[in-house]
Amino acid sequence: MDAPKEWEGDNVRRTTSASLLRWWRATPVRLGVAAVLLVAAIGAAPAHAARRLSDGQQEAVTAMARLDADFYDSQEGLYKVRGGAHEPEAALWPTSQVLAAAIAVAKITHAPADLARVRRIIASLSHFVTPEGVYHARVIRSLRYYDDNNWVGLDLLDAAALLHDSSLLAPAKRIFSFLISGWDAKQGGGVFWADGHPDRPTVSTAPGITLGVRLSALDPSGSYREWPARFYAWMNSRMRGPQGLYWDHIQYDGQIDKDLVSYNQGVMIDANVAYAVRTGQRAYIEQARRIAAATAIAFPGPWRNRGNYAAFDAIYFVSLAHLSALSPGATNLAPARDYVRWERATAAAPRLARLENELLEQAAFVQTAAAVGD
């Protein structure tokens, strides 16, 4: 479907504060535009009453504590890519996923220590910051990846809502401006992968839809209305295949890599969820449901991915949780819960202890367990 040509202000108001509160309480990670609307429109989210955590939530809390113990270097103030005394510092991509995991846990517990962890990780982003106020891929001067910056921008909006800290909105806005600067106007659109890299992947463009739509809830200026719509239209005209799923990237020579990867579907589910909340149009929920249903057909059987793919799957599963929270029954969370059970058993096995001792994989487990674990 097309992006909206104008915002439906009355429809936004019809998305009641009660429904947004239900979504806030039910959705532990990457909260979508509803989190921003809650803080901006109806005040701070209420403190959570003491309650028993689900098994998945408790596993997420425990796994996050273990992640800190295994990977955090308190002297450097950074996480290491693997557990061990002489491992290198993690790059921005895994660090962004650790921040998303920390936000997920703090959203569950609201414990002072968990909120402090979120603040600490945000402060550590200063190691990656560029003179322009966006982020290098590594702690040394390196390329600026548009997709990595997308994840950080979404994390910052989630943290702004969670911590009631409006100072985090400015760097998120700078990231969105950076995305616009990466738009390839000469070759028909799409955001580049990185500085000087001509590939245009789905994950450089699609998360920018959600980022821009969420920012529009706070600042309805033209760029936050025009550019998400442009990104959305490009994704659906250039990157959507006949199955209704989204291909991976356009190469430097204009050829399309038609690989199907889980998180490319997840970011477009989230984009439609964001538009559904922002506009009140049911058609976006239906589009998100179609993507989820097509993904279930294209990715049959157990999900058993590792490394980067575990993080890709986490992004997809979290998007399903967002869709389910906004529209109960809209999608089937059983495969995601089966995935958590499999990872739980894997982590307990001596041969594969601690999910292969990879920071990115641990962060992925925390996010998935927090979002869908039973």
Q: Model features per residue range: what roles?
A:
Residues 1-25:
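N-terminal secretory signal peptides that target proteins for export/translocation
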Residues 32-41:
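Bacterial N-terminal signal peptides
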Residues 47-49:
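Boundary at the C-terminal end of the N-terminal hydrophobic targeting segment
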Residues 51-101, 105-147, 151, 200, ...:
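CBM-like carbohydrate-recognition segments
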Residues 106, 160, 216-220, 276, ...:
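Short coil/turn linking the two alpha-helices of tandem helical-hairpin repeats
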Residues 115-218, 225-226:
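Extended ligand-binding groove/face enriched in aromatic
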Residues 195, 205-208, 212-216, 223-272:
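Active-site cradle of extracellular carbohydrate-active enzymes
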Residues 264-279, 284, 288, 294-296:
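Oxyanion-binding "anion nests"
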